[in-house]
Curated annotation (Swiss-Prot):
Identification of the protein by name: 2-succinyl-5-enolpyruvyl-6-hydroxy-3-cyclohexene-1-carboxylate synthase
Pathway: Quinol/quinone metabolism; 1,4-dihydroxy-2-naphthoate biosynthesis; 1,4-dihydroxy-2-naphthoate from chorismate: step 2/7; Quinol/quinone metabolism; menaquinone biosynthesis
Cofactors that this protein relies on: Mg(2+); Mn(2+); thiamine diphosphate
UniProt enzyme class: transferase
Cofactor note: Binds 1 thiamine pyrophosphate per subunit.
UniProt source species: Chlorobium luteolum (strain DSM 273 / BCRC 81028 / 2530)
Function: Catalyzes the thiamine diphosphate-dependent decarboxylation of 2-oxoglutarate and the subsequent addition of the resulting succinic semialdehyde-thiamine pyrophosphate anion to isochorismate to yield 2-succinyl-5-enolpyruvyl-6-hydroxy-3-cyclohexene-1-carboxylate (SEPHCHC).
Subunit relationships: Homodimer.
């Protein structure tokens, strides 16, 4: 057996075992050194794959796909800076516990650190952001293929273990790279005959059941039973089953539930928008929880953290599926590692008295909802707030949402209507909260879910991932992109630096003076630029029926958006004063 044949077989075995381990989505960027891997994927009929000219975009697509499926997508690239372009997506996957597998082709040992072209030190390139990394050997008949199968299984298990995250396999190849099949049999392959025939993974790993500690659960039940003003928080919760269990617990105990957009519960019919309450001083003066039970990850809005930091509740309990710490302001009195669903179900029935805050709160939320609906009246000008509100009203149950960071996610989290009978998947990159790779991540998220996705994104984030528009023509379902173009970084207008007139516009707002119409034409996408709420509704619904992806660009003003936020917040404050005075 020659080197080409050994490399061909090695790559085919590696790819086949990944597929058997249920890591069957491959995001490939073309390159010469990675030819054996690319050929192995292309020639495996059970592999799903997508080609990406840009590794950075590929990394974020894989991230979005894994967010949707809960399984790692596999990234394949050539040597050199190609693998470095995955770094932002790897950081996000690590920070937000998303499984991912990177396989980078590399030069062999004798070409390392000697001036060889397109060669960098790739082993361990992701440092602490990888859950595990392995420098694989150059394919050789001297190395048992069983060890390769075992390594693949371990890589998948490490990606899916607690805490989930990215894994890196660095694979050196020696020329020639083009595949050459083996004619006949070879002793090297004999130990794999049974594996080849049965179609199952050679080794399977069972993840441990994350059952909660009985003593900790007894403590939490007692705290919930005796608290006067308890509050449940649903932070980032990837699993719909977990999210539903937390919502059921809140209903059973009749206590308030703060549902973050990333929990999947924020848009569920009947969910109260506690984001509005926590941003309202008059409300906060009447509600000071003495117990917080926080399920899942971090929150989008800063107001809850600021309020809880000031209130210092007697007990702050965090329940998560992994051992990593979540305590940004260090308020936690009890941390429990457990399946969220199991923990929520185990806390059912521990309290009979409803929270005293519920009745006045419901009146407050009803008035807030009416004020927001006033902003969506058909004939008035479209705004960032009314666009976010209408998206939540118009999107259908079989679709999904994805949102960029900065102002986009805050508009949806704060002002969306809760109308979905069974909730709605809503993805966002909140691990490191960057604005890079958002279009790519949304595309992967929709493909992973098998749903049409609507993306809400700002103009700076849109420019950051502009080349990802080339992906949209090949998606299985067209995407809506709702672009909030306020000509700069809108969130800075809400920060103290906005008062520094001599430096603000050029150094923070950074206006780019562009419109997306020509970008849409360049990539063969539909384009619309509505000006009123009625026009937006028409464009949004038409995009849902169109065979191509659509960019709906909303030209807005940063200063007008700030003023609308302040006016709305003043109304919310008045509603809170009335709701509590009337009692």
């Amino acid at each position: 057996m020659n080197n080409r044949q050994a490399t061909t077989i090695w790559s085919a075995v590696l790819v086949e075992e990944l597929i058997r381990q249920n890591a069957s989505m491959f995001c490939i960027s073309p390159g010469s050194r990675s030819t054996p891997l690319t050929a192995a994927v292309a020639r495996n009929p059970r592999a799903s794959w997508k080609m990406f000219p840009d590794e950075r975009s590929a990394g974020f697509f894989a991230l979005g796909h894994a967010r949707a499926t809960g399984r790692p997508a596999v990234l394949v690239c050539t040597s050199g800076t190609a693998v470095a372009n995955y770094f932002p997506a790897v950081v996000e996957a690590s920070a937000d516990f998303v499984p991912m597998i990177v396989i980078s082709a590399d030069r062999p040992f004798d070409l390392q650190e000697c001036g060889a072209n397109q060669t960098i030190r790739q082993d361990g390139i992701f440092g602490r952001y990888a859950r595990w990394h392995m420098q694989l050997p150059q394919p050789s008949t001297e190395i048992p293929l069983q060890s390769l199968l075992s390594t693949v299984e371990h890589a998948v298990a490490k990606s899916l273990g607690a805490p989930r995250g990215p894994v890196h396999l660095n694979q050196p190849f020696r020329e020639p790279f083009d595949p050459e099949p083996l004619e006949g049999q070879d002793p090297w392959l004999e130990p794999l005959q049974a594996w080849k025939l049965d179609g199952r993974p050679r080794t399977s790993s069972a993840q441990p059941e994350r059952r909660p500690d009985a003593r900790a659960m007894a403590t939490i039940r007692e705290l919930l039973a005796t608290a006067r003003r308890p509050l449940l928080i649903a932070g980032s919760i990837p699993s719909p089953d977990d999210a539903r269990a937390v919502a059921s617990l809140a209903d059973d105990l009749r206590i308030p539930l703060y549902a973050d957009l990333s929990s999947g519960l924020r848009l569920t019919e009947g969910t109260l928008a506690w984001q509005q309450a926590f941003a309202t001083p008059a409300f906060l003066g009447r509600f000071r929880p003495d117990l917080v039970v926080h399920f899942g990850g971090r929150l989008i809005a800063r107001h809850p953290s600021a309020a809880l930091k000031a209130w210092k509740p007697a007990h702050y309990v965090v329940i998560r599926e992994h051992p990593e710490r979540y305590a940004p302001d260090h308020p936690v009195s009890l941390s429990l590692e457990s399946s969220l669903q199991t923990a929520a179900e185990g806390l059912m029935g521990c309290r009979s008295e409803p929270s005293a805050i519920k009745e006045p709160a419901e009146g407050f939320f009803l008035h807030c909802s009416g004020a927001l609906d006033d902003l969506t009246e058909a004939s008035i000008p479209l705004s960032e707030i009314s666009a976010a509100r209408q998206i939540s009203q118009l999107i259908t149950p079989g679709e999904a949402l994805f949102t960029s960071n900065s102002m986009s996610v805050r508009e949806l989290d704060s002002f969306a209507a809760a109308l979905q009978p069974d909730g709605l998947p809503c993805g966002l990159n909140r691990g490191a909260s960057g604005i890079d790779g958002i279009i790519s991540t949304a595309a992967g998220y929709g493909e992973g879910l098998g749903r049409k996705v609507t993306l809400l994104i700002g103009d700076i984030a849109f420019l950051h991932d502009l080349n990802a528009l080339s992906l949209l023509r090949s998606l299985s379902r067209p995407m809506r992109i709702v672009l909030l173009n306020n000509n700069g970084g809108g969130i800075f207008s809400f920060l103290p630096v906005a008062s520094c007139n001599d430096i603000f516009e050029e150094h923070f707002a950074t206006p780019q003076h562009f419109h997306a119409q020509h970008a849409a034409g360049m990539f063969g996408l539909r384009y619309a630029a509505p000006r009123t709420n009625r026009e937006f509704e028409e464009c949004f619904l038409a995009a849902g029926e169109a065979p191509q992806s659509t960019i709906i660009e909303i030209a807005s003003s940063r200063s007008e958006n700030v003023e609308q936020h302040r006016t709305l917040q003043a109304r919310f404050n008045a509603f809170a004063e009335t709701a509590f005075t009337d009692r």
